[in-house]
Amino acid sequence: GVLAAGVLEDIPAEVNEEVIQTNLLGYIRSAQVVLPWFKQQKHGILINNISVGGWFPVPYGAAYSASKFGLRGFSEALKGELTQYPDIHVCDLYPGFLDTPGIQHAANYTGKAIKPAPPIGSPQKVARKVVDIIYDPQATTTIGATASFLKIAYNLFPALSRAITASVIRTYLKQANPIPATSGNILDPVDYGTSIEGGWRKSFIKTLGGKMLIAGLAAGLAGLTMGLMMGSRIRNLLS
């Protein structure tokens, strides 16, 4: 998928619309093309790489979040439509943050250089999961402990999760290097970032920004963990 980062009103409307076109409508159109063939042959596998963004919203990436939440809803509805076809499988992948050039390609209207949030996963791991699903279709596959944690945290404490995430992002942007606004690969192709990996895992903790973001995320995750534990204890006392 593609990402446009920034305060909502600072991002041109056509950029946000292209995010929806790529991340949501692209999947819908693809399904419309292949499903008649699947139904004719009575079997098939449709794999949607949604990302943890389908469960956990991204402040300063509102259109991206809309596309991912929308894609999750589309996929869930489609599974209902296909209950009469037990051998047609709709399989959703929810990986966490990956070491790809996606951030390099992103439209960026924050005025600052942005980086993926740690811990950063391997794209090869996701590729292996896709192969696994082809041989053993699963309706939902969450990849990585971080993705699983964020999903649970947002389901239990949505307001706290949003507040912590937004605070961490704002803290990072205050000290990040300034750069000019760019539409990235949203409106036009780019000739950079053509490798499989983005190189983020190797360089991240070497930078001050990386260390600060890691510290902020660690504090945020600790807060969410405490909230989860307290919520669990309260429910146990009331049960």
Question: Model segments located where?
Answer:
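Residue(s) in the substrate-gating loop at a strand-loop-helix junction
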Residues: 51
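Active-site loop immediately N-terminal to the catalytic Tyr-X3-Lys motif
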Residues: 8, 58-63
